[in-house]
């Protein structure tokens, strides 16, 4: 069938197999063109491996360092009449490229929060990899089932403490408008921490340590976004921010429990980008459209793959990586520095319905959004019939 994007609200409900494969190939090509990346990981577990920063981490590990990779993700398979999710096609493309390079790659599809999927991952690592020397935690989910109690927790995107009114951009209706968000109650904050905090990251590391699958000196990192004043009320100082603070707690706990193995655990703060997660957050489409404009003009714009390649070479596997006062690895400085933020703030204050497309790089935002689902990718013929079926072997 010929596949065109079906957009509903902030998500695209279908995906393009060839477009996803082309996007993965572009990222692999970028990493392969970077030359020798130096010493790095050899056996990598990526939890949340199929899109965005998690997929980029898997690509850098495999094609930058020649590492064996095990991915864990939760994707919907295709049928003859319905496309799979983008992450399914990304993973199929990754497997094909890895196989051609003679690299070990396996992927487990299921709920990473569950005990069953952790057990499957442990069996696979024992059988195929021995031990892992890098664990990437890059999950984004709106809900989590507690593996002990079966209780379902749901995350909310709300400010903490007081109501918040600000500008936002409705991608569906192409309009700038004010949005008012009521503050979260204690239960909503607690549930968001359960879903998006560090508990599950810690449980993964506990399970791997118990099975003696963490190599001496193994590194692990969970990804976060910290941002600055413009996004703090909905991000840093909001329910998501509270959950992300819990990652700092988890990092310290992981290090403390695994001292004899010299395990290093970091929270890594990355720049704001169009991802399936960020497009769902109020304010972010407007903010990202503006930072794309400013950072492209400054020559500092980067996508997922450039950010992760930099994280690995300049921070995670550097001799003595620079840490912030909370002990985090920071890759967001080109966005969060005062000069860049001042330019974004000036645009933010000026932007209206009438001048939005002129002041922002919404065209760039929309292109990246479509690309998440395999659409608007350079060199792909979108009039060509597509086979929706794609496998991971």
Curated annotation (Swiss-Prot):
Which organism is this entry from? Pseudoalteromonas atlantica (strain T6c / ATCC BAA-1087)
The protein's site described by Plays an important role in discriminating NADH against NADPH is found at 75
* Catalyses which reaction(s): a 2,3-saturated acyl-[ACP] + NAD(+) = a (2E)-enoyl-[ACP] + NADH + H(+)
Gene that produces this protein: fabV
Q: Does the keyword Coiled coil apply?
A: no
In this protein, the active site sits at: 235
Q: By what name is this protein known?
A: Enoyl-[acyl-carrier-protein] reductase [NADH]
Q: What is its EC number?
A: 1.3.1.9
Q: Which UniProt keywords apply?
A: Fatty acid biosynthesis, Fatty acid metabolism, Lipid biosynthesis, Lipid metabolism, NAD, Oxidoreductase
Known Pfam families for this protein? Eno-Rase_FAD_bd, Eno-Rase_NADH_b, Enoyl_reductase
Residues annotated as binding NAD(+) = 48-53, 74-75, 111-112, 139-140, 244, 273-275
The subunit structure is: Monomer.
Which InterPro entries does this one have? Eno_Rdtase_FAD-bd_dom (IPR024906), Enoyl-CoA_Rdtase_cat_dom (IPR024910), FabV-like_NADH_b (IPR050048), Trans-2-enoyl-CoA_reductase (IPR010758)
Binding, substrate? 225
Q: Which GO terms describe its biological process?
A: fatty acid biosynthetic process
Molecular function via GO: enoyl-[acyl-carrier-protein] reductase (NADH) activity; NAD binding; trans-2-enoyl-CoA reductase (NADH) activity
């Amino acid at each position: 069938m010929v596949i065109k994007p079906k957009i509903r609200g902030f998500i695209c409900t279908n995906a393009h197999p060839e477009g996803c494969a082309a996007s993965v190939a572009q990222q692999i090509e970028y990493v392969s063109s970077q030359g020798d990346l130096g010493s790095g990981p050899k056996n990598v577990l990526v939890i949340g491996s199929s899109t965005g920063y998690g997929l980029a981490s898997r690509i850098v590990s495999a094609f930058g360092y020649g590492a064996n990779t095990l991915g864990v993700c939760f994707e919907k398979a295709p049928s003859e009449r319905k496309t799979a999710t983008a992450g399914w096609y990304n993973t199929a493309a990754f497997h094909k490229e890895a196989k051609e390079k003679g690299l070990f790659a396996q992927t487990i599809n299921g709920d990473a929060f569950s005990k069953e999927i952790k057990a499957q991952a442990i069996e696979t690592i024992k059988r195929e990899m021995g031990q892992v020397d890098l664990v990437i935690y890059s999950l984004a989910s709106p809900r989590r089932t507690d593996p002990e109690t079966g209780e379902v927790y749901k995350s909310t995107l709300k400010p903490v403490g007081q109501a918040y009114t600000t500008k936002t951009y409705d991608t569906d209706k192409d309009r700038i408008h004010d949005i008012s968000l009521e503050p979260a109650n204690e239960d909503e904050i607690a549930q968001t921490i359960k879903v998006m905090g560090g508990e599950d990251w810690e449980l993964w590391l506990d399970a791997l340590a118990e099975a003696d699958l963490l190599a001496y000196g193994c590194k692990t990192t969970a990804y976060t976004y910290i941002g600055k004043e413009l996004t703090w009320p909905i991000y840093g100082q909001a329910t998501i921010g509270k959950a992300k603070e819990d990652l700092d707690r988890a990092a310290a706990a992981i290090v403390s429990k695994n001292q004899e193995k010299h395990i290093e655990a970091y929270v890594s703060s990355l720049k704001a980008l169009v991802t399936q997660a960020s497009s769902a957050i109020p304010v972010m489409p407007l903010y990202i459209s503006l930072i794309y404009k400013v950072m492209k003009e400054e020559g500092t714009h980067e996508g997922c793959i450039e950010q992760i390649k930099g994280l690995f070479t300049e921070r995670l596997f550097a001799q003595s990586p620079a840490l912030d006062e909370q002990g985090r690895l920071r890759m967001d400085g080109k966005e969060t520095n005062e000069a860049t933020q001042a330019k974004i703030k000036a645009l933010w204050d000026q932007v209206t319905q009438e001048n939005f497309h002129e002041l922002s790089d919404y065209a760039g935002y929309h292109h990246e959004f479509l690309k998440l689902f395999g659409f608007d990718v350079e060199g792909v013929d979108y009039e060509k019939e597509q086979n929706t079926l794609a496998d991971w072997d």
